[in-house]
């Protein structure tokens, strides 16, 4: 960020499976390549807020030189999307979900001692949570689930209405799936009674590649593979067939959630795969019978606790 703010070339170390000892690969970007002789406009370096789920990572980032980070988003395992895996050996409950324990709880007192601002995320979408977060030393909270189903979000109106109607009937569930994501990280998957795509089989196609993994081929060149791509292709690229079990194509399905799912020559459109935080199962308390609401209503709801505390 320091380099880019000055329009200078920068690079990041690239994670590549199978690199021989002593070999390092980087991703490099030189902004000058894209200015085509023009004079770049002065920009301000943006703040870097790192999403973390452990004290050790926060401490390492806070002490890192070269500008480092300006704050933290402390995300718990109840948050939607990808979750950090439990520390230590992963143990699953009877529902096949990772079990999180005391080792996965971030010590907020230690975070506060680092002297950087932080926000809490995951299960924070309740009026009383903002006050509790501030009492613990946080600047505020990060809320995803409530905003994800608001009128202003990118989810299709049909999808939001279907989920909220199911939630009002108590017919929605959120599962932490240890296999769905090709990254290997646990991923929250929503199931609900009104899901029109439930049970529809999908042909394995990998053509977006946002979650692919870089690896070294036999000829020493770098290529990419994905555990959600066609199994034969993945294995031919040196992947372990066991890694393909239970994988879903997050790239295409998440695009379908926002109404830009691809249409295939075979005659089908990519189906949706919804992710959300655990609090979706309790959203009926906020809805109070509604099947739509605005982002403004969410903000007013979240601030109600602090307003009441000041009154």
Where are these regions (language model features)?
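Alpha-helix initiation/capping motif
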Residues: 54, 125-126, 151, 156, ...
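Surface cap/lid and interfacial helix-loop subdomains adjacent to catalytic sites
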Residues: 102-113, 125, 135-136, 147, ...
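C-terminal extensions of enzymes
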Residues: 183-311
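Hydrophobic faces of well-ordered beta-strands that scaffold small-molecule active sites
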Residues: 48-50, 72-74, 118-122, 141-143
């Amino acid at each position: 960020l320091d380099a880019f703010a000055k329009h200078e070339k920068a690079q990041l170390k690239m994670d590549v499976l199978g690199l021989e000892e002593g070999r390092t690969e980087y991703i490099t970007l030189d902004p000058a390549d894209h200015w085509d002789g023009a004079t770049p406009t002065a920009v301000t370096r943006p703040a870097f807020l790192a999403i973390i789920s452990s004290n050790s990572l926060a401490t390492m980032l806070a002490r890192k030189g070269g500008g480092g980070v300006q704050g933290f988003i402390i995300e718990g395992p109840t948050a939607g999307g990808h979750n950090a895996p439990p520390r230590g050996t992963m143990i699953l409950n009877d529902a096949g979900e990772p079990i999180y324990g005391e080792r996965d709880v971030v010590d907020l007192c230690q975070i506060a001692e680092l002297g950087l601002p932080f926000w809490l995320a995951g299960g924070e979408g309740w009026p009383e949570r903002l006050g509790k977060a501030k009492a613990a030393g946080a600047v505020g909270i990060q809320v995803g689930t409530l905003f994800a189903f608001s009128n202003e979000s990118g989810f299709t109106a049909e999808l939001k209405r279907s989920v909220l109607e199911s939630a009002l009937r108590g017919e929605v569930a959120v599962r932490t799936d240890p296999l769905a994501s090709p990254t290997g990280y646990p991923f929250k998957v929503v199931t609900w009674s009104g899901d029109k795509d439930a049970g529809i089989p999908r042909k394995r196609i990998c053509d977006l590649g946002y979650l692919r993994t870089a690896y070294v081929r036999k000829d020493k060149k770098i290529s990419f593979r994905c555990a959600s791509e066609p199994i034969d292709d993945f294995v031919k690229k040196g992947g372990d067939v066991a890694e393909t079990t239970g994988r879903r194509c997050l790239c295409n399905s998440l695009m379908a959630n926002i109404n830009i799912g691809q249409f295939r020559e075979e005659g089908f459109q990519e189906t949706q795969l919804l992710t959300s935080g655990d609090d979706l199962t309790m959203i009926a308390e906020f809805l109070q019978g509604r099947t739509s609401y605005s982002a403004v209503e969410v903000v007013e709801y979240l601030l109600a606790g602090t307003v009441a505390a000041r009154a």
